[in-house]
A protein has these predicted regions:
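Structural signature of tandem alpha-helical TPR/SEL1-like repeats
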Residues: 30-38, 67-76, 101-111, 138-147
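Bacterial N-terminal signal peptides that target proteins for export
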Residues: 1-9
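TPR/TPR-like (Sel1-like) alpha-helical repeat modules
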Residues: 115, 138-158, 164-189
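Hydrophobic face of amphipathic alpha-helices that form TPR/SEL1-like repeat modules
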Residues: 55-62, 89-98, 126-133, 162-169
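Short helix-capping/linker turns of helical repeat alpha-solenoids
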Residues: 33, 41, 46-50, 62-64, ...
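Bacterial N-terminal signal peptides
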Residues: 9-19
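Alpha-helical adaptor scaffolds
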Residues: 26-27, 58, 62, 71-118
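N-terminal leader/linker segments that initiate helical-solenoid repeat arrays
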Residues: 17-47, 51, 206, 214, ...
Length: 275
């Protein structure tokens, strides 16, 4: 059974990654424009903006405007996470779970729980998979059911797909996941000429983001806002919800499916841990 579950986790992660990597991945970049964005975010972090810290971590992680540096990426994800930045909590948590010099399973799980409790669905999905694996921590199917159900109810596309896979596979259909399977069973079939909610979200997710537009908007807004790290409440930009901003997504708005950067490396990290 364990081998079957591990295989399903790996396949589900890789299938989810496939259509999204090229569309959403922040590619390495050494142009003058990319370096200018990197410099701008470096300045904003010194002023104390947690959103800038999270974005700077992403730039280091991808090698955008600078040399790729996972240690510095981890540093900035952790620093932003300290101030309650949900996306950074997720990313730092995932990096804590990977086999590396800074692996710390307890800290990784704790960060994912903090982020998930703030209704950040990728963290809830990750927790559900981790509790199912019986690898990083002992298997807990009650926790699996709770976290996967939470992610499903937050309209996380990958949680919905994974739940359906678990429900339809003969090897996992009898797992004691009553709340999750009840949600899957309650899904109504759609007309042949209409799109399901999953298909509609897939269309949203595969659209390539305009990173320059995101960066320009966030930099302009942060330059006009007060630093937020003194009170640790995430974005303090007046008149905007945290989830309106690319580097500060908390999934507070139903239309905001998830941070565009989460679909590839986070799932890859989890997939590597179930082999």
């Amino acid at each position: 059974m364990q081998r079957i579950v591990n295989k399903l986790l790996l396949v589900a992660a890789l299938v989810a990654i496939a259509p999204l990597c090229n569309a959403t991945q922040l590619a390495p970049c050494k142009t003058a424009e990319c370096e200018a964005y990197f410099d701008a975010y470096t300045i904003l972090t010194k002023r104390g903006h947690s959103s800038a810290m999270a974005t700077l971590g992403e730039l280091y992680y991808s090698g955008y405007g600078t040399e790729k540096d996972l240690d510095k990426a981890f540093k900035w994800f952790r620093r932003a996470a300290k101030f309650g930045h949900t996306t950074a909590q997720y990313k730092a948590g995932i990096m804590y779970l990977q086999t590396s010099a800074y692996q710390d399973i307890d800290k990784g799980i704790a960060l994912l729980k903090r982020s998930a409790k703030a209704t950040f669905s990728p963290s809830a999905l990750a927790l559900g998979k981790i509790y199912l694996q019986d690898k990083l921590i002992p298997r807990d199917l009650a926790a699996t059911d709770r976290w996967l159900t939470f992610a499903y109810k937050l309209n996380n596309l990958e949680a919905m797909k994974f739940a359906k896979t678990l429900r339809e596979s003969p090897d996992t259909a009898k797992l004691p996941l009553p709340k999750l399977f009840a949600l899957v069973d309650a899904e109504k079939p759609v007309a042949a000429d209409s799109k399901s909610s999953l298909e509609e979200m897939e269309i949203i997710l595969v659209e390539a983001p305009d990173y320059a537009a995101y960066f320009d908007e966030e930099i302009a807004q942060l330059n006009q806002s007060r630093p937020d790290t003194a009170k640790g409440t995430g974005s303090s930009i007046a008149g905007r919800t945290c989830s309106d901003i690319w580097a500060c997504s908390s999934e507070g708005d139903s239309e905001r499916i998830r941070d565009l950067q989460l679909s590839d490396w986070g799932n890859i990290a989890l997939a590597l841990n179930v082999r």
